[in-house]
């Protein structure tokens, strides 16, 4: 595909303008089911977000991919404020459509549960090609923003894929096929990644446009190698500064292992700083000193170099790989006859139409 582009909230840009990219992060979370888990997920401060983004830019960063889907924190208008504040500094924002893990949706009455897959695909396609709904598909009224989604999210739970999650994976794959839009999947604690990748590919998605997130929380370098070699997808390691799960050194050494195996083209990085105390400027509003997006540059990249990851590999991880995986693909038609037998059998077993 000539003239490869990524879709930001302010319009399509050549992928060469993405620069150093954080492939999975958050600025605004305007409520939703995550807030019931912890109040730190409520993130409404536009000024703090702009300051955080500027610190990211000051250290050489350019693009942030915000992975908040409709009804799980996404705020189109506030994110547009942030994007407009940093556009002249070289900052870009990509937003998502799609879904999170099944835990966040009523299994009987949510629109993910009751609306036919074909219609949900149309709704997601519209968010990518016409504009995101400012009301996040919260009710019967839809108001399209000028801002379009540039990535599709799906999610799975811990150690299992719920039937609604398989439905959301089908929506993501079919939407990607029809629009060329890339996909990123939340896997709870890095489990079910291999199955997620195989299901997406089984529905017809291009593995070159798929990122699987959170495998850093399942620190098994041999599993990473297996997922990449068997499916060809990209792993988004989104967890520097998460010592409650593992030390940074373990993540750095696991990345080094993959690079040494010749798999550096299948790695992206991010901070996934989706809580108030994961960002420096939000932390200050609560009277606390915390790390933030600058941690990637100040602490983690020097550590990658210390463990022996080459500058060339780091450039691939931060620039070349996001440029490839976030570029829109050629549009295709979805052919149900090409869906894998394994996926069709699983749909039947889970009673999915």
UniProtKB/Swiss-Prot annotation:
Effect after changing residue 34 to Q: 20-fold decrease of the catalytic efficiency for D-xylono-1,4-lactone-5-phosphate, but almost the same affinity compared to the wild-type
Cofactor annotation: Zn(2+)
Annotated family: Belongs to the metallo-dependent hydrolases superfamily. Phosphotriesterase family.
UniProt GO MF annotations: 1,4-lactonase activity; zinc ion binding
Cofactor note: Binds 2 Zn(2+) ions per subunit.
Annotated positions binding substrate: 244-245, 275-278
Pfam family, one: PTE
The reaction(s) this protein catalyses: a 1,4-lactone + H2O = a 4-hydroxyacid + H(+); D-xylono-1,4-lactone 5-phosphate + H2O = 5-phospho-D-xylonate + H(+); L-arabino-1,4-lactone 5-phosphate + H2O = 5-phospho-L-arabinonate + H(+)
N6-carboxylysine sites (modified residues): 153
Alphabetical UniProt keywords: Hydrolase, Metal-binding, Zinc
E.C. number: 3.1.1.104, 3.1.1.25
Domain of life: Bacteria
Residues reported to bind Zn(2+) 2: 153, 186, 214
Name the UniProt record assigns to this protein: Phospho-furanose lactonase
Database matches in InterPro entries: Metal_Hydrolase, PhFuoseLconase, Phosphotriesterase
Gene Ontology BP terms: catabolic process
Organism: Mycoplasmopsis synoviae (strain 53) (Mycoplasma synoviae)
